[in-house]
Amino acid sequence: MSGPPSAPQGALAAPRSPAVRRKGLQAPSWGSPGRPAAHSPWACGPPHWGPQRGPRNAAAARPGPRSRWHKRCAAACGACARPPGHQLQPPGAGAPQPGVACSYLGPRPQRTPCSAQSRPGWCAGPRRRHAPGTEPHVAPGRAPPPRAGASPGSRLLPGSPSLLLPAATWRTWGQESKVLRKILKAWDPFSLL
C-alpha cells in the first residue's frame, strides 16, 4: 500500500495533477483488469456446469448474445459472442444494401432440444429460475416426494377403508339411523285418516 492512509487505493494522484486532468476523475480501481482473459473460466462470471436452457422458436436461429446476461458477458470478454477467427467490422458494414437479397443467411437450422445445446466459450448462462425438479411442469421421474397428508394425486375414494376419518365422524357414525327410527316410531300413519 502506498499513499496516505486516508487516500483510497488507485486515487494516489492529486485531483489537479496533469494525469487526472487528462483522464478525468475516476472511481478508484483495485487492480481489476479492464478485459479479463477470454480463456479464463471466470471470464464471464462463476463457472456453471450442467445442462443449459437454449433459446426457443425464432431465437434459436439468431446467433450471438440473446439476453441481458449474455450482452454483459460479451461486452466483458467477447468469448461467448464471437466465433474463432471473427474479424471486427466497421460500423454499418454488416447492414444489407437496399435492394440486395440476403443470401448469406441461408435456411434456418432445425430446432434442437435445449439440453443438447452448448454455448461456445466458458459462458455459464443466466441462473435458473427454478431449482432442478421444481419446474412448473415437472419432468417424469423428477417429481418431488409426496408431502405428509393426502395429496391431490393420491386421494382415496370415500368408501375406502384406509381413509382416516375425523374423530367426530366416528362418534356420530350410525346416529342418523337411530334418529330416523325414532321419527318413524312416533309417526302414526293412521292418525292422518
UniProtKB/Swiss-Prot annotation:
Region of interest: Disordered: 1-67, 110-160
Protein name from the UniProt record: Putative uncharacterized protein ASB16-AS1
Organism field: Homo sapiens (Human)
Highest classification ranks of the organism: Eukaryota, Metazoa, Chordata, Craniata, Vertebrata
Compositionally biased spans, kind Low complexity: 50-64, 148-160
Highest rank taxon of the organism: Eukaryota
Gene: ASB16-AS1
